[in-house]
Design a protein with these regions (language model features):
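Flexible, glycine-rich beta-alpha linker
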Residues: 130-132, 158, 175, 179-206
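Alpha-helical substrate-binding/gating segment
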Residues: 192-195, 200-217, 224-252, 261
């Protein structure tokens, strides 16, 4: 019988971890770490140990890394600044840089601790926002159809910048210049949430297209960005278990987009398919077909035609 891998999971009280933990518990021997022991609803996460991975004294949490085969880094600390969540029209956005720097320092601590402990691989949650300038400036303007992980990671906000920093920092550790090659897989997660049409007909909670864009424009966008629960589970399993994640230059470092096989996708899955063997099972156009017909394509559709846009 094959030995169960030991996986350290950070940020286990968060939303994405909540979707993954049941499957992870079945497949691996887990070590669970977060800065708090309860999830968003105040429920205790079984098995979690409280530790602050952003603290500069890595000896405080080195024990969690020792003997682990892989680290799944989902930890994130939101900046202590009130923001509206509306891209391009958020007066609080300028004040988020220091908070995001703390998250970059946490990523550094994770990479360094993994390297020191002999961990083979770190799988880190990056974000589609690591290169969201292309989406904001080009995709929704009809000037570009697809964004690839091979494109220079350019973001127009500090959250996206910090995620791009995770990626480039990971390359330093994967390059072998620090003594050995730490394998690093970066997951640019899309929209791992419900994107049914009713969410987009009222007041928007988040705005990803452009300030003042319609809810239906955001509905189309999120249909392209959607990541189903089972595709999320598959992607993470493959990121942890794939034997060889070396790129064409022999460096074990890969950036992949985390979306389902969506008809309206505008992010490339090429590296996820080629390197990880990811084979998405779901498509938002099918999963939310009733809303697509009602709002976008039926006789009473409220939106103009086109894959994206209002």
């Amino acid at each position: 019988m094959a030995r169960r891998m030991t996986v350290l999971v950070t940020g286990v009280s968060g939303y994405v971890a909540g979707q993954l933990l049941p499957d992870l518990r079945r497949r691996y021997t887990l070590r669970l770490v977060d800065v708090r022991a309860t999830d968003r609803r105040g429920r205790r996460v079984p098995g979690v140990e409280v530790a602050d991975l952003a603290h500069p004294d890595r000896d405080r949490y080195a024990r969690f890394f020792r003997g682990a085969d892989a680290v799944l880094h989902l930890g994130y600390r939101p900046p202590d600044v009130k923001t509206t969540g509306v891209w391009g029209a958020d007066p609080g956005a300028l004040e988020t840089c220091d908070g995001e720097l703390a998250n970059v320092r946490m990523a550094q601590n994770v990479y360094r601790s993994a390297l020191d402990a002999g961990v083979r691989r770190v799988v880190a949650a990056s974000s589609n926002h690591a290169a969201d300038w292309y989406e904001h400036a080009l995709v929704h303007a009809g000037r570009r159809d697809v964004v690839s992980p091979a494109d220079l990671p350019l973001s127009d906000n500090f959250y996206g910048w910090s995620k791009a920093a995770y990626e480039l920092l990971g390359f330093v550790y994967a390059s072998g210049s620090l003594g050995r090659k730490l394998e690093v897989v970066l997951l640019r997660i899309g929209a791992p949430r419900d994107v049914s049409g009713r969410r987009y007909l009222g007041k928007l909670v988040e705005q990803h297209v452009a300030p003042g864009a319609s809810g239906l424009a955001n509905f189309k966008r999120d249909l392209g960005a959607w990541l189903s629960p089972r595709d999320l589970r598959q992607l993470v399993r493959r990121a942890i278990e794939k034997r060889d994640v070396r790129n064409a230059d022999g460096v074990p470092w890969v950036v992949v987009y985390g979306i389902s096989g969506n008809t309206r996708a505008f992010w490339s899955l090429e590296s996820a398919r080629r390197v990880l063997g990811y084979a998405p099972q779901d498509d938002s156009e099918v999963a939310f077909a009733k809303d697509v017909r009602r709002l976008l394509s039926g006789p009473r559709a409220r939106a103009r035609g086109g894959r994206l846009g209002a």
